Amino acid sequence: MAGHSKWKNIQHRKGRQDAKKSKAFTKVAKEIIIAAKGGGDPVANSRLRAAIAAAKAVNLPKDKIETAIKKGTGELAGGDIFELVYEGYGPGGIAFLIEVATDNKNRTVAEVRHILTKSGGSMGEAGCVGWMFDKKGVLTFPKEAYSEDQLMEIGLEAGCDDVIDEGDSWAVHVDPSSFEDVKAAFEQAGVTAESVELASVPQNTIEVDAETGKKLLRLVDALEENDDVQNVFANFDLPDEVLAEMED
């Protein structure tokens, strides 16, 4: 039950950097609005509960959280946010899944298509790459705090799929249907995750050369800078020399 996903490691590093950007507030507020469409009580709505936790992690003010919930439930105007997934290709034929939350579908699809095309990629048809990814619950734990054996002991009993070596952290992968049970098992054991998310995990990754890797990272950055883009997933793996340059 081991492996190493450098791409996933980059995602987590970028996630920590994202918290410093003003976009983080917009991103978590939109997720709360969408989640609250399923009910405004976080006790009964696990997605809303996770969205509120993510909002608190980036210090979104309490009144902003409450406003976003009310927009989602329809108590306030401004809840017309649509959740969509675009599929396409980046440089080197790398598969991309792009999750967006938008109040204007036409604007967003045009912007995402432009970013992909400008980067040497292309927008694809629905279903063209989605089959290459599996939806997983992902719980990330710091290596300095927990061993792989600790996490496996708790996770396997609760129903986790795998424990992945992410470099400076462990990632526990869970089938979405078991996500709440596995999260609860770790919480009851006093084992605290750095992050908890539902992610589209590539079934296989493609290692790319340094030049292609840099192009792909620029594409990821351009997509993530778009206000409507919530998450970006891709199936490439970065060579060590590219990672070393990123550490400089």
From Swiss-Prot:
One of its GO terms (biological process) is regulation of DNA-templated transcription. Signal peptide: none annotated. SUPFAM superfamilies: YebC-like. GO terms for molecular function: DNA binding. Residues 1-22 are annotated as: Disordered. Keywords: Cytoplasm, DNA-binding, Transcription, Transcription regulation. InterPro entries: Integrase-like_N, TACO1_YebC-like_2nd/3rd_dom, TACO1_YebC_N, Transcrip_reg_TACO1-like, Transcrip_reg_TACO1-like_dom3, YebC-like. Residues 1-15 have a biased composition (Basic residues). Pfam families: TACO1_YebC_N (PF20772), Transcrip_reg (PF01709). One of its GO terms (cellular component) is cytosol. It is found in: Cytoplasm. Belongs to the TACO1 family. PANTHER family: TRANSCRIPTIONAL REGULATORY PROTEIN YEBC-RELATED, TRANSLATIONAL ACTIVATOR OF CYTOCHROME C OXIDASE 1. This is Probable transcriptional regulatory protein Dde_2325. It comes from Oleidesulfovibrio alaskensis (strain ATCC BAA-1058 / DSM 17464 / G20).
